[in-house]
Amino acid sequence: MEFVSTQIQSAYEDYEEKERHDRDIKKKLASFKSAEFGHNFAEQTSQNSNPRKRKISEKSQKERPIRSLNAQVLNMFHGNVELIKQQRALLKVLSGKKRKVNEVLKHVENIELENSTTHRDKRKIAGTRINSSTFPDDFGEVLYTKNEWDLLINSIRIRFPRLSATSRKTLNMITEKYNERLHSAEVSIWDASSMPPIQLTSDDIRVLHDLKEDDETEPNELESISDTRSVILTLSQALKQDTSKIVEEEQNIEEVEGGMPLSQGVEDVPDSEPEVLAKNERSIISLNSDMIVQSSQVEPIILSSDAGTPQRRRDSSQLTQPLEEPILTTHLKSSPALSKHSKTPTSTQSPIKLPFNFRESTPAIDQLPSFLDDWRGAVVSDESQEVVYSTAQNHSQTKSSAYSTARSNFEDNSTRKTLNTGENEDSITVLKKTIVPFYGKINPEKEIVYHSIEENEEGETREIKSKLMDRMRLPNNEEINVIPDSESDSEHDVSFLEVISVVKRREPELEGDFSGFNTNLFNPPRQDTLISLDENDSEEVFRSQSQNYIQLNNTQDQTQDPTSKQREPTNTQLEPDNEVVNDEETFEKWKLLLKSNPEIYQQIVTFKPLFLSEIIKFLEANGFLMPKPKDVNLLKRFLDTQSVCFTERARK
């Protein structure tokens, strides 16, 4: 109880002391605002502290806001210059701003400019004593020299970088910070005891990391050197030690224990024999390929280049072939190795794991592997035809055209079709292959009607409707390759039908190349893009896709014939002109004109849309008039074939 009472008493005394201090500060502030501050501080009264003011009516009375300390002083002393000067001098002394520090430093620098040594020399020459009020006896000894003062200022700036005019720091703050540094320096001796020296000797490192001496070796510790020791730098090699003893000990241990080498069929040879290294690498590749074949539970399917249907290999061990035998290049990946006759790395081929069977696991539709592209390119068509579109080379060309840019199409727009002009027959046989993706099962009970266009020798066209089952029964000149086996109970099973059909069309009677008349109505869907469909939507989508493929095959490879009759209205609504114009030459001239204009050419290669009206004006200025709508349509078709972005809107 006594302890609690003493604590309460001490807290009360502290509170009284704080209140007394606050009262003193308020009294000093009140005296500072009085008019006679500094003159008659003892005789000031409360009456003189508040000067009288003129009586002004309330309407005309308007007080100015006091926004600074000088304005407050002027308002208090009513323009008395002497009092204002005294108060300002007092405010300078009492204010804690940075200007006080600057004044002190400036005063010291002004004194220091008068060199103390010159004054001392003058005193010696004159032999008289200078007034002590101006220069004290110890003048020039207590004050700093200019170099010493510069060092002091720089040390203050380095130790206290936050000392600036904005932070309102004074010399008292510098003193406090300096005392704190001195106090912390006394404490830092305990921190230094826990820190090691900066430079460590080899003995210190050995003790610190618990390293062993060079002579100390444990009997159970074995060091193994791999066949790639020329590449991997061991610790013994880094320390420049002799590794011959270690190698001999390792060989003796292997002979005594009869242990197997690290890799079967690989010899440990020095770096100077590249032939043996290449042999070791080939043996490693064959071992890895055997492991891949043994671990796969799926019977692989490969495409033979001698037959039109895929063949199934029964023995999986045949996939691992020696490197000297020819292997199908589409199912190989290369690995660098050294040749026997040269030190330059050559490409050795090794078989890889073939694609999985769709019966085992069916992946997501949008995540099918990219090897399906190689399957489509590996299908071999009838070799008796002159124009074949199913080779791997042509397939890669058609695939690359899907990713071509506007610049490649604009600069190099050559046709990839080759016609058999050596034979003088009425018609030309062109082999067309379309890949039609089938999604899910095909229900034979549903009746699906497909539309196709057929052209006879006279040039007449007619529309043919066929059912799904009739479509599945192909004529003798068509064949179906199913890759892979699609007989599965899964609802989302996927199979690809590669339909290779023969289309007969008339040979153009006129001379010249009419490949520019190919109607590019739409871009065909990419064959390697699959979209998952429901069972209810498969009927309509399959009808539309097959119809698009058939129309594309018939419209892209038929030239304009002036004697042919107008076709019946189809979904594409083709209306060929009666006049035959060599559009290819016109397209080439337009292309050269557009390339000659740097602004238009830059917009083309940067995929910026051009205004159709400006292109028409540019061509008309160069002699190509377009009075008819069909000329404008021809220009639009030219821009479409060149993959040029344009808009028909007018420039704002």
UniProtKB/Swiss-Prot annotation:
Subcellular location: Nucleus
GO biological process: DNA recombination; DNA repair; DNA replication
Record's keyword terms, sorted: DNA damage, DNA recombination, DNA repair, Nucleus, Phosphoprotein
GO cellular component: Slx1-Slx4 complex
Comp. bias (Polar residues): 1-10
Region of interest (Disordered), residue spans: 1-23, 37-64, 303-353, 553-574
Top-level taxon of the source organism: Eukaryota
Record flagged with keyword Cell inner membrane: no
Subunit structure: Forms a heterodimer with SLX1.
Similarity field: Belongs to the SLX4 family.
The protein's name in its UniProt record: Structure-specific endonuclease subunit SLX4
Gene coding for it: SLX4
